[in-house]
Amino acid sequence: LCEKIDVNIEDISIGMGLDKRIGGRFLRAGPAYGGSCFPKDTKAIVTTAAKFKTNLSIIKSVINSNKNRSSLLLKRVLKILNGKVKNKKICFLGVTFKANTDDMRDSSCLTMIPSLIKKGALINYFEPTGKKEEFKKLVNVSFSKNINTAIKNSDLIIIHTEWNDFKSINFKKIVKNKRFKIFDMRNIYSAKKMYKQKINYYAIGG
């Protein structure tokens, strides 16, 4: 909704977090949730409720919303690239479902990357944990051993995971393609600073 009406989700999160009944700790915009807990636990709760003929409509809607999140992000990527994906060099920085883990279970990139490949994109990624087993069988996917190599020839750089390693990258110095774009799925950068550097920057919810 914020993207539709040109409102910054970070401002909304700060405002909501001021309510002590809500708090701001978990109000972070981003891709779909994943890992070993949320996906399994939400489904287990719904299944248990069904056995006792109880309809947990809110939790069901959360599960469905999370399923749709990756497809919405994919549409955003297509929009950023003006629908021209074939032969575009797209770099994913981070592929785990969150930072400080090597867990890729239900990571949104597991849906996005194969979809982009089908559309002809050339995918490259860097993952601080060195994780690459999931993509070994995919064509047009390469793994870089460092950030500089990963991003230097990119048309689009996607910040998929909020690793601290990614927060101080000098994109202007490293990326050769002067018309490169950044899609920050974790909002780890200041949009104002990016615009000041004349970088084509796109964030979640803004």
Protein language model features and the residues they cover:
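Structural/interface elements that position substrates and couple domains in central-metabolism enzymes
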Residues: 1-206
